[in-house]
Amino acid sequence: MKLSIGIIFCFLILGVNSREWLTFLKEAGQGAKDMWRAYSDMKEANYKNSDKYFHARGNYDAAKRGPGGVWAAEVISDARENYQKLIGRGAEDSKADQEANQWGRSGNDPNHFRPKGLPDKY
């Protein structure tokens, strides 16, 4: 629903041409892949206190794609955090995750959250 309203808004109100819209969708798809890669790496690493780093890194990589990547990172991050709240995860941890998400989306270095000893592979 949110996506369809956004599409209609862009076409009717903003007058976005099809080329810009296709670029936005491409960036969003690439950004979603960046978010998935960060999530997969986090699960693979299974490293204590590394989740904030992977949150920041996924958002950072997605945001580098452009406005579509920023949008995808925000939608995915918000959906994940809302789900975590729904299942009873602590609000304090969710707030810290969102801060890491915003840090990365803003173009700040995700290594700020990198824990010591995390393998260089990540």
Curated annotation (Swiss-Prot):
Pfam family, one: SAA
Subcellular location: Secreted
Keywords: Acute phase, Amyloid, HDL, Secreted, Signal
GO cellular component: high-density lipoprotein particle
Biased composition (Polar residues): 99-109
One GO process term, biological-process aspect: acute-phase response
Protein induction: Up-regulated by cytokine stimulation.
Tissue specificity statement from the Swiss-Prot or TrEMBL entry: Expressed by the liver; secreted in plasma. Expressed in synovial fibroblasts.
InterPro entries on file: Serum_amyloid_A, Synovial_Prolif_Regulator
PROSITE patterns: SAA (PS00992)
Domain of life: Eukaryota
Signal peptide: 1-18
Coiled-coil ranges from the UniProt annotation: none
Residues covered by region (Disordered): 88-122
Main localization, broad class: secreted
Functional summary from the UniProt entry: Major acute phase reactant. Apolipoprotein of the HDL complex. In vitro exhibits antimicrobial activity against Escherichia coli, Streptococcus uberis and Pseudomonas aeruginosa.
Family: Belongs to the SAA family.
Disease: Reactive, secondary amyloidosis is characterized by the extracellular accumulation in various tissues of the SAA protein. These deposits are highly insoluble and resistant to proteolysis; they disrupt tissue structure and compromise function.
Name of the protein: Serum amyloid A-3 protein
